[in-house]
């Protein structure tokens, strides 16, 4: 019995290692030290195209509202950190308000200046200032801040799937966005349908292409409608049944009616 139990544990650990699942996200009241810089327009969302290395689009609009950040590797995690929410605050500059502000990881920071480095949008950096001192704080350039991971709550939104440009009958690339709670997705699986439209009940793992975009390179013509199964960093599984229709198109959004709780 003990031997069998050990084998089961070993199998579970193997699965966790294969899919890169974390043991879970720990949300605490503790603050950690970090450095913050900013880039782009003073009141912008960071990149000029309102995008970033996570693949999110229109980060100047809700739910991002330009409150975005590049993260260095401990935050970006080669794309696994895309969509995570953090509270940040600054206290050691005369222009700092000391009030926490929430930002979302949407991009990669290639110039780490500390163990944790938030390269913020101009909007997010200025949001840490006292009223009327946004520009004065931005003139500091680089400041010490504190941060902590917090749950994401995109009020009024369900998880959205964007079939990326270039997708075709044997290649499917999907951006996952607006996930609540952890904000991140660590595994995405797809279920095809039979010609009749009924689901095959067979899940096929997709692999992370880059950022929050997942891909499937198929050896056959893919048959929709497609169901998508997401696993969050905390291990919660959410399924969007037949969310992408049989007559799907590339470069198109497909909204779901599911959300992480």
From Swiss-Prot:
Q: Which GO terms describe its cellular component?
A: extracellular region; membrane
Q: Which GO terms describe its biological process?
A: plant-type cell wall loosening; sexual reproduction
Q: Which UniProt keywords apply?
A: Cell wall, Cell wall biogenesis/degradation, Disulfide bond, Membrane, Secreted, Signal
List each copy of the Expansin-like CBD domain by range.
170-256
Expansin-like EG45 domain span: 51-157
Tissue-level expression reads:
Expressed in roots.
Q: Which cysteine-cysteine pairs are annotated as disulfide bonds in the entry?
A: 54-82, 85-152, 90-96
Gene3D superfamilies in UniProt: Expansin, cellulose-binding-like domain, RlpA-like domain
The stretch of residues making up the signal peptide is 1-24
Mainly localized where? secreted
**Where in or outside the cell is it found?**
Secreted, Cell wall; Membrane
The answer to keyword Signal applying to this record is: yes
**InterPro entries hit by this protein:** Expan_Lol_pI, Expansin/allergen_DPBB_dom, Expansin_CBD, Expansin_CBD_sf, LolPI, RlpA-like_DPBB, RlpA-like_sf
Q: Specify the superkingdom.
A: Eukaryota
Q: How does it sit in the membrane?
A: Peripheral membrane protein
Q: Which family does it belong to?
A: Belongs to the expansin family. Expansin B subfamily.
Name the job this protein performs. May cause loosening and extension of plant cell walls by disrupting non-covalent bonding between cellulose microfibrils and matrix glucans. No enzymatic activity has been found. May be required for rapid internodal elongation in deepwater rice during submergence.
Name by which UniProt lists this protein: Expansin-B2
- Organism the protein comes from: Oryza sativa subsp. japonica (Rice)
Question: Could you tell me the gene encoding this protein?
Answer: EXPB2
């Amino acid at each position: 019995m003990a031997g069998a139990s050990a084998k089961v544990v070993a199998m579970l650990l193997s699965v966790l290692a294969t899919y890169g699942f974390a043991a879970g996200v720990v949300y605490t009241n503790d603050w950690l030290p970090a450095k913050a810089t900013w880039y782009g327009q003073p009141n912008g969302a960071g990149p000029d195209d309102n995008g970033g290395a996570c693949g999110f689009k229109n980060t100047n609009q809700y739910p991002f509202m330009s409150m975005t950040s590049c993260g260095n590797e401990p935050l970006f995690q080669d794309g696994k950190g895309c969509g995570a929410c953090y509270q940040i605050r600054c206290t050691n500059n005369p222009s700092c308000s000391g009030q926490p502000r929430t930002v979302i990881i949407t991009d990669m920071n290639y110039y780490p200046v500390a163990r944790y480095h938030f390269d913020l949008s101009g909007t997010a950096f200025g949001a840490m200032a006292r009223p009327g001192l946004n520009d004065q704080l931005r003139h500091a350039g680089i400041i010490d801040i504190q941060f902590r991971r917090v749950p994401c709550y995109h009020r009024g939104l369900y998880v959205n799937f964007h079939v990326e440009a270039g997708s075709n009958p044997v290649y499917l690339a999907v951006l996952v966005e607006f996930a609540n709670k952890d904000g991140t997705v660590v595994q995405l699986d797809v279920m095809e349908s039979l010609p009749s439209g009924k689901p095959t009940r067979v899940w096929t793992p997709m692999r992370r292409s880059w950022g929050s975009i997942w891909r499937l390179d198929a050896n056959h013509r893919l048959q929709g409608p497609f169901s998508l199964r997401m696993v969050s960093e905390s291990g919660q599984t959410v399924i969007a049944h037949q969310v992408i229709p049989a007559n799907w198109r590339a470069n198109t959004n497909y909204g779901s009616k599911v959300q992480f709780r």
